[in-house]
């Protein structure tokens, strides 16, 4: 179901007869809401060239829930940029947008900032002024999609959010974004999303095709899931074999099969979910997966390919050390809200049991039925236990019933769309980008060799960013 549009006209026409002539009463004046505006504008602290403001939005764009939210936004000062407005959407879900304004516009994509007015938003439930704070969940999993939280952490978060958990889906964020567009006074804008921001950008385009000029989808999560398996992360599990084998073939070649090593680990240890979480976290430090000395870790503590191989050979020391060093949890809530993450994922996702509106008691039996039919190759080199034990599944199995995000059309509108993905990405694997390309009538895919997640923000080279610049400036 689409978000409901608020009615703006209520016209009563009274007819009276007198002397054979019909006389109409004067119509009631239509009640029209004023357009959204940005308030409390001021220079963004530490971000020259950007003005920070607040956008007031309804708690519930469907009109059932009462209340309002104030979302922080940042807008570049070049309001008359020749190519219009570009809204940059961060991921998670759980990341704010405002802290990234200067880095993206002036350090990573200055060629675009000359021609576009960059704008960002702290999406509902995120950032300095609106982050949903669930302390136990924040401490246990932080920004991880994969590490499973405890039942106590999930229950605490559900109690903290209460009925408001219904109002933090991407459907609601899409409504916020269109109010932001209106407040800026632009008819069309370009949307550039990274990671979960690709999901949000695509969902916006599906709901507002006439207001979408171009789309950039960087590190892609498909906007639709007809197979109902994205939350099992089956594509990511299988992609691990391809990524590690590719890393091992890079000179100097390993001389062994890292996928077979990982398959052995997944079947002989009880922490395969945490091993998988470590690999996904590690890609942000070292997309080669083989550097023993990556920045951000103590010397000699990198190289998960070698650590997994050594563990299979009987020495788990390095692997155990990596699991400790890259253990998730503890991210500051203003930088990443685990509470927003759980509310959005559970409200947006399609699961083996259906959606967040399915009764909690019926969810595990549905998962069990799916797992009984799932072939080993669907999760290899991991196991079905790894799939069902991931954070998405663990969080949402016991999450209270809540409003499910309106489902979009399977095919996106025919707007120019660039998809860009690293072939070493495990968080949003290349296979997902190829799937989304099939839903995109005017899409083109650029694969960045040797790169992992978040091309525009983290790519070491320039191939991906050059493709984005050419696409948008062309």
Q: What kind of region is each of these model predictions?
A:
Residues 3, 9-13, 57, 67-69, ...:
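Intrinsic-disorder/low-complexity peptide segments enriched for small residues
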Residues 1-27, 55, 177:
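Secretory targeting and sorting signals
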């Amino acid at each position: 179901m689409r978000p409901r549009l608020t009615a703006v006209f209520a016209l009563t026409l009274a007819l009276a007869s007198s002397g054979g002539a019909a006389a109409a009463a004067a119509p009631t004046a239509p009640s029209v809401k004023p357009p959204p505006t940005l308030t409390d504008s001021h220079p963004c602290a530490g971000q020259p060239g950007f003005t920070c403001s607040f956008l007031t939005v309804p708690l519930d764009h469907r009109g059932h829930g009462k209340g309002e939210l104030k979302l922080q936004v940042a807008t570049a000062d070049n309001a008359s940029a020749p190519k219009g407005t570009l809204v940059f959407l961060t991921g998670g879900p759980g990341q704010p947008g405002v802290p990234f304004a200067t880095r993206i516009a002036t350090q990573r994509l200055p060629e675009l900032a000359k021609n576009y007015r960059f704008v960002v938003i702290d999406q509902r439930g995120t950032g300095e002024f609106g982050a949903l704070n669930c302390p136990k969940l924040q401490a246990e999993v932080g920004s991880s999609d994969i590490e499973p939280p405890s039942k106590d952490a999930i229950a605490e978060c559900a109690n903290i959010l209460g009925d408001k958990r219904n109002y933090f889906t991407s459907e609601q964020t899409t409504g916020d974004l269109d109010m932001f567009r209106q407040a800026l006074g632009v008819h069309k804008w370009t949307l550039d999303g990274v990671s979960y921001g690709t999901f949000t950008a695509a969902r916006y385009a599906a709901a507002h095709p006439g207001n979408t000029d171009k789309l950039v989808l960087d590190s892609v999560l498909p906007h639709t899931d007809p197979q109902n398996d994205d939350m099992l992360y089956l594509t990511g599990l299988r992609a691990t074999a391809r990524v590690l084998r590719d890393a091992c073939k890079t000179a100097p070649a390993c001389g062994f099969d890292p996928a077979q090593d990982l398959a052995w680990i997944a079947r002989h240890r009880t922490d395969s979910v945490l091993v998988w979480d470590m690999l996904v976290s590690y890609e942000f430090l070292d997309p080669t997966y083989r550097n023993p000395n990556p920045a951000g870790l103590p010397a000699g503590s990198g190289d998960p390919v070698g650590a997994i191989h050594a563990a299979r050979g009987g020495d788990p020391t390095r692997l155990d050390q990596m699991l400790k060093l890259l253990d998730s949890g503890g991210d500051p809530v203003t930088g990443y809200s685990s509470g927003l993450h759980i509310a959005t994922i559970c409200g947006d996702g399609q699961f083996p049991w259906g959606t967040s509106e399915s009764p909690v008691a019926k969810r595990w039996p549905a998962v069990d039925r799916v797992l009984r039919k799932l072939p080993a190759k669907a999760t290899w080199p991991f196991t079905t236990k790894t799939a069902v034990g991931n954070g998405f599944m663990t969080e949402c199995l016991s999450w209270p019933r809540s409003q499910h995000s309106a489902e979009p059309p399977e095919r996106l509108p025919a707007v120019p769309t660039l998809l860009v993905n690293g072939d070493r990405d495990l968080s949003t694997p290349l296979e997902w980008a190829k799937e989304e390309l099939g839903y995109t009538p005017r899409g083109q895919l650029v694969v960045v060799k040797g790169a992992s997640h978040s091309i525009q923000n983290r790519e070491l080279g320039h191939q991906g960013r050059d493709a984005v610049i050419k696409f948008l400036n062309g």
